[in-house]
Amino acid sequence: DYEQNKNIFDNAKNKEDLDPLLEGITHINVYTKSKFSLGKGLSNLANIGFDIDEQHFQSLEGFWYWNITGKRYDFFKNMTGFEAKKKGLVLCEEGSAVTNSDDPAFQEEIKRAIRAKIKQNPELLTELIKSTLPLKHYYYHQGTKNILAFKITDKSKYQWQLDEMERIRELCQKKMHEVGQLSSYPPLENELAKITRPRFK
């Protein structure tokens, strides 16, 4: 409901955290519709493959639902992010889930996958190292009457994923400072001014 979502946004304590017009200024949105390749690439739905425990996954979303359903359905390994989410939700609704995203053990598995994905994809790792803005996660869509309507995701539920990504970034930046190589990666924010901010009609 547009009015309900707008009220949620209006009442938010930190509106800048939820405003796509400020992405690249106050934050990077980890979302398939992010303005930046970093935000898109860090999304679980991104089709960025990785190997873990001698197995290959086409997307982190596939790994997510492969774990939630007890590692029984190997077809998740070859699915795109959106395919995995669609099939995974159906299986969970049918009672195939053996755990959930609140389970600490499950969260550790996803963190391992996040580390593998970032480590094995140099371009994504480089972009992460170059960035300095906080990582956020929210959805939005264009509302009526030329006004944005926001569908707000409960960020606290998935903040543990963003925390892991930021932890990786901090460790890599610290290591590169120690070896004097960080200067070869100018901050991503220096490049953002070249990108035109989107206009919502």
Regions found by a protein language model. Name each.
Residues 1-199:
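Charged, low-complexity intrinsically disordered segments
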